[in-house]
Amino acid sequence: MEYVYAALILNEADEELTEDNITGVLEAAGVDVEESRAKALVAALEDVDIEEAVEEAAAAPAAAPAASGSDDEAAADDGDDDEEADADEAAEAEDAGDDDDEEPSGEGLGDLFG
């Protein structure tokens, strides 16, 4: 990441994007420079207009969350949520009563742990 920052600094200072300039900026920042990475960065950015790339990145909108339906559908569903919640609670209460018929659990745990 620091290599990209070095390229942005050089671009902002209207300096030429060369291996020597990248190395100089990174060394001034106390970074151990890998010559191959500096060379690769210069080659990768050779045909890139950095100003344009920065503007495009800044103008890109954030992804919006997906809509679940139209406003008409949402208005029609408003009253149903409470009924569905009540039905779910009733089903859970019935399931809770069924646990009395079962034997205490834990007897088969010895098989799991040897």
Swiss-Prot record:
Give the residue ranges for region: Disordered.
Answer: 55-114
Q: Name one GO molecular function term.
A: structural constituent of ribosome
Please report the organism this UniProt entry assigns to the protein: Halobacterium salinarum (strain ATCC 700922 / JCM 11081 / NRC-1)
What name is this protein filed under? Large ribosomal subunit protein P1
Described by its record, this protein's role is as follows: Forms part of the ribosomal stalk, playing a central role in the interaction of the ribosome with GTP-bound translation factors.
| Gene name for this UniProt entry | rpl12
Q: Which residues form a coiled coil?
A: none
- Sorted alphabetically, which InterPro entries does this protein's record hold? P1/P2_N_sf (IPR038716), Ribosomal_P1/P2 (IPR027534), Ribosomal_P1_arc (IPR022295)
Q: Which UniProt keywords apply?
A: Ribonucleoprotein, Ribosomal protein
Entry similarity comment: Belongs to the eukaryotic ribosomal protein P1/P2 family.
User: Compositional bias of type Low complexity: which residue ranges?
Assistant: 56-69
Q: Which GO terms describe its cellular component?
A: ribonucleoprotein complex; ribosome
